[in-house]
């Protein structure tokens, strides 16, 4: 059974991101467009809570149900919400095109109801040596976010 989800991002960065998963255990395809980004890499994460009552800050930390360190999307030791970076050319829109095998739209670890956050700076993928590298990727301010909701199949 295919599951689809959508996230409308608001803030200084704005856009729409779609999620699609063919069945439990298969990769999730993440696609969409974001505007309002400076040229360069921007951290792109799923955060724990679907709460935007205080803007992006109330979305909590990266979604990390297994207590792992922050890492790159290809790392075994990473938060489930660590989706790496999206690259802005300086022109609108910035395309989002990610396939990830760790996030899911099924079961207890589903990202549906959680928040996508776009950050001001590049995610160092846990390799930067900064005190925040192993928790946030030192990706800077939260400049856009939105709650992931169920979409029509």
UniProtKB/Swiss-Prot annotation:
Enzyme Commission identifier(s): 1.15.1.1
PTM annotation (Phosphoserine): residues: 59
Chain residues that bind Cu cation: 45, 47, 62, 119
Gene Ontology biological-process entries: determination of adult lifespan; positive regulation of mitophagy; regulation of synaptic plasticity; removal of superoxide radicals; response to oxidative stress
Location relative to the cell: Cytoplasm
Cofactor section: Cu cation; Zn(2+)
CDD domains: Cu-Zn_Superoxide_Dismutase
Cofactor note: Binds 1 copper ion per subunit.
GO cellular component: cytoplasm; mitochondrial intermembrane space; peroxisome
Record-listed Phosphothreonine modification sites: 53
GO MF term set: copper ion binding; protein homodimerization activity; superoxide dismutase activity
Enzyme class: oxidoreductase
PANTHER family the UniProt entry points to: SUPEROXIDE DISMUTASE CU-ZN -RELATED (PTHR10003)
Function of the protein: Destroys radicals which are normally produced within the cells and which are toxic to biological systems.
Subunit organization: Homodimer.
Family: Belongs to the Cu-Zn superoxide dismutase family.
Protein name: Superoxide dismutase [Cu-Zn]
Native source species: Drosophila melanogaster
Top-level taxonomy: Eukaryota, Metazoa, Ecdysozoa, Arthropoda, Hexapoda
Gene name of the encoded protein: Sod1
